[in-house]
Amino acid sequence: MFTGIVETQSEVLGLANGVLRLARPRFFKSLKKGQSIAVNGCCLSVNDFSKNEIEFCLMQETLECTNLGQAKAVNLERALPADGRFEGHVVAGHVDGVLAFLRSEGERFYFQMPTDFSQFFVHKGSVALNGVSLTVASESEKEFCICLIDQTLEKTNLGKLKVGDMVNFECDLLAKFFLKSLREK
């Protein structure tokens, strides 16, 4: 489980034959094989690592429903330890899909509304974009808006978005469970 509070960004060193290679952040000192790390919000298991690199194996499904095949720099967050401080919101690392960045107006960033998931986008609700825990500021049939503070713009890859860039999204897990429970009644 993750919180959507990104620890750092990393450069994508390469992607070939389903193996994603990232530059290893200096403070990621105690890595182990099999450890879960959210990469642009997608939960991946460390396959191998060295002093300077971390390696992950990606399935075709992962490449098809995320932006990892096109990413140059990614957000990283290690899994929340059992005794860790919980901030952000519950992020499973199970990306729902990708959507397009439409425009920004100051601190307001607008994204394409994913039609099949629009019921999970509510004013003041949570969403993870590229693994970042965010609050929906407004929503309509075609788009939704989030507001980004300077720290988020500097610490994550959201500050480098260009119109048309695709971002990973994960809807609020609690909202998914709540809606499912209502449908089953």
Language-model features: locations:
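Conserved loop->alpha-helix
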Residues: 1-185
